[in-house]
A protein has these predicted regions:
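Conserved acidic donor-binding segment of nucleotide-sugar-dependent glycosyltransferases
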Residues: 337, 341-349, 357-362
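Nucleotide-activated donor-binding/catalytic signature segment of Leloir-type glycosyltransferases, i.e.
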Residues: 264-288
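Glycosyltransferase donor-sugar binding loop
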Residues: 42-45, 192-193, 224, 251-265, ...
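Conserved donor-binding/catalytic core segment of Leloir-type glycosyltransferases
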Residues: 5, 159, 214-231, 237-240, ...
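Donor nucleotide-sugar binding/catalytic pocket of nucleotide-sugar-dependent glycosyltransferases
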Residues: 40, 144-206, 214-216, 282
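Short hydrophobic beta-strand element within catalytic cores of glycosyltransferases
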Residues: 322-326
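Aromatic "clamp/platform" in nucleotide-sugar-dependent glycosyltransferases that forms part
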Residues: 305
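Short alpha-helical donor nucleotide-sugar binding micro-motif in glycosyltransferases
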Residues: 90, 152, 284-285, 292-297
Length: 393
């Protein structure tokens, strides 16, 4: 039996894609006969999760172990306890799967693997996107030359979520590692859990309307995901303002964790555009509530400046919702080719026009939604095959 260790800084929902992808991949690998353990910390933004530290927890056949982490510096998630566990126990595993970069957990895991001769896979999860690398560029450049260059040179493989993410990382890999030393690169699609394809619970739908009665009888324009700088929330605010002025039935529904204080900024932008009363902020929803929201929506919108995969896009399509996404979401080619939605430049006028087109043509919207479901179902099957390949790397 293959013994796999996955190392991720945190599984808190506020951190988006990796916190969803890691457990999903772990469960898939267990179903294929592997033994999977996940090392992570209890860090959750400025605070900490109340989790059982030092006591393994078994879920879906996966063993999770939580270690105390520091909340400062917030982005680094320093954890001496995690480092000690990696040093003393990593040799018991056949391969280690390391999530993200520029972060303590990844650095400690790669170092421990090299020290004990254990092969490891690096999974940047979008951190090599040129748009994101421009943020804190000097700090990241120093970290790359001091630490990440060695981490990548000694990796058994580098994993990407989409072919587009791999393409965007090629120049960086060749420069920082050297074209002769670049490890194997594989695309391992994240996929969507089966429950997203299930019909929405009527009770969850009723509960949502009871909590937010202003949604009754409206066409829901849905943003579903982290309220983050890269999500294009300024574009969304301007685009929705244009739509709302011409369509009194349009109502913006914003769902997801506010990790960077962008909820207040979005409120300000909507207030300045005089459409704040046509928006509802529903916060973080559980699985059933999320399916109820997406299942009853008119259109899903994600005008991101950068998106290495777009987990929320895939989940919306699994629920049969047509999507409007920017051409910087790495799923954009698949969405356009399948006719599952509209792909537009990352600017407000084009986004508004696409939203209006879908709201005006319900038959076309339903057809897009069905094509999206088929696209995601097919991608889920391919993701399973890719995960099996990742287990053999």
């Amino acid at each position: 039996m293959l013994r796999i260790l996955q190392v991720i800084a945190s599984l808190a929902p506020r951190y988006g894609g990796p916190s969803v992808a890691c457990p999903a991949l772990a469960k898939a690998l267990v179903r294929q006969g592997a033994s999977v353990t996940v090392f992570t910390t209890n860090v959750d933004g400025p605070g900490k999760h109340e989790l059982p530290l030092g006591t393994p927890q078994k879920r879906d056949g996966v063993q999770y172990e939580y270690f105390d982490g520091w909340t400062w510096p917030a982005e680094y998630k320093f954890s001496p306890a995690l480092a000690r566990a990696l040093f003393w126990r990593v040799a018991a595993f056949d391969v280690v799967h390391i999530y993200s970069m520029y972060i303590f957990s990844a650095t400690a895991a790669a170092w421990a693997c090299r020290r004990h001769g254990v092969p490891y896979l690096l999974h940047p999860h979008g951190t090599l996107d040129p748009y994101l690398r421009r943020r804190h560029a000097l700090r990241k450049r120093a970290y790359e030359w001091l630490i990440e260059r060695r981490n990548f040179r000694h990796a058994a493989a580098v994993l990407f979520n989409t072919p587009e993410e791999r393409r965007l990382a090629e120049a960086w890999l060749n420069r920082i590692v050297g074209s002769a030393d670049v490890p194997e690169r594989a695309v391992v699609p994240v996929g969507v859990e089966e429950h997203w394809f299930a019909p929405a619970d009527p009770a969850a739908c009723a509960n949502l309307l009871a909590r937010f009665p202003e949604l009754t009888g409206k066409q829901w324009v849905i943003f579903f995901g982290r309220l983050s700088f890269k999500k294009g929330l300024d574009v969304l605010a301007r685009a929705f303002a244009e739509v709302a002025r011409r369509n009194p039935q349009a109502h913006l529904v914003v769902a997801g964790p506010d990790t960077e204080g962008f909820g207040a900024r979005l409120c300000t932008w909507l207030r300045q555009a005089q459409v704040l009363e046509k928006a509802s902020f529903v916060g973080v929803l559980n699985e059933q509530q999320s399916r109820a929201l997406l299942g009853a929506g008119a259109v899903f919108v994600l005008p991101s400046y950068s998106e290495n995969f777009g987990q929320a896009v895939a989940e919306a399509m699994a629920c049969g919702l047509p999507v409007v996404i920017s051409d910087r979401v790495n799923l954009c080619s698949a969405v356009a080719q399948a006719g599952a939605g509209l792909v537009v430049p990352c600017e407000s006028a084009a986004t508004a026009a696409a939203i209006e087109q879908i709201l005006r043509q319900p038959a076309q919207a339903r057809a897009m939604g069905e094509r999206g479901r088929r696209l995601v179902a097919g991608a889920a099957r391919r993701a399973g095959r890719a995960r099996r390949r990742a287990g053999r790397l």
